[in-house]
A protein has these predicted regions:
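Short C-terminal beta-strand
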Residues: 201-214
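Glycine-rich/acidic phosphate-handling loop/turn and adjacent ATP-lid/helix
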Residues: 153-177
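ATP phosphate-binding glycine-rich loop and adjacent ATP-lid/helix-beta elements
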Residues: 168-196
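Histidine phosphotransfer helical core of two-component systems
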Residues: 9-12, 16-20, 32-63, 74-78
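Short beta-to-alpha transition helix within the HATPase_c
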Residues: 58, 67, 71, 78-95
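Short beta-strand element(s) in the Bergerat
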Residues: 102, 154-158, 204
Length: 218
């Protein structure tokens, strides 16, 4: 009997919660769009090429966070489908790079990571892929980038590898530094090494092993 009496109150609470979440979604989305618009406007008005590149990088980071937010509110708010995000990210960054001479291969295992880790994971992936697109291949030099996500149970492993010119062009960049700091938020470590050490184009393999929470009570 008590359950029947509580049902209307529970339904009202659920409706109120849904309305509040919808309002939060709307406001966050609008704020991210406003930030992106301001960055884009400043980029278009800036004549210095280095400043334009820096603003483009910031815009890519904001867009990555916006994509995370959209996916969380459209799906399970507690879990983030990393493989689906990586498909979107790859398409967005490849289009932005405008490099028809680059081939990007995806090898993605479905992995759901906790929502609390979503933004850091997304930014790590964005930095690593953007770094490869920007620095691994000089103008006129094509190549291949592989984006791989695997589920090893206790960890999920993100690997982004290229067959570009190697670590000399990429090792000291801000993007890799930022990716390393963000990996620490995931209790992970960014590891970089030549993808093919014996080749005249050794490339770079960047790997992040992200610990996954255990399910169950053991």
């Amino acid at each position: 009997m008590q359950d029947l009496e509580d049902a209307p109150a529970s339904a009202e609470l659920a409706a109120t919660t849904a309305a509040l979440l919808g309002e939060v979604d709307h406001r966050v989305k609008n704020n991210l769009q406003l930030i992106a618009s301001m960055i884009l406007l400043q980029q278009r008005r800036t004549e210095d090429e280095a400043a334009r590149r820096a603003l483009k990088s910031v815009l890519e980071r904001v867009n990555a966070v916006a994509t995370v937010h959209r996916r969380l509110f459209q799906g399970d708010p507690h879990l983030f489908e990393a493989a689906d995000f990586l498909r979107d990210l790859t398409g967005d960054l490849a289009a932005s790079a405008g490099r028809d001479d680059l081939q990007i291969e995806l090898d993605l295992t479905p992995v759901a990571i906790p929502a609390a880790s979503a933004a850091a994971f997304a930014l790590v992936a964005s930095e690593l892929l953007a770094n490869a697109l920007k620095h691994a291949f000089p103008p006129g030099v094509g190549g291949r980038i592989v984006v791989r996500l695997t589920d090893e149970g206790a960890v999920c492993v993100l690997t982004i590898a290229d067959d570009g010119i190697g670590m000399g062009a990429e090792a000291a960049g801000f993007g890799l530094t930022l990716a390393g700091l963000l990996a620490q938020q995931l209790h992970a470590r960014l590891e970089t090494a030549p993808a093919d050490p014996l080749s005249d184009r050794p490339g770079v393999r960047a790997t992040v092993r992200v610990p996954m929470p255990r399910s169950g009570g053991g």
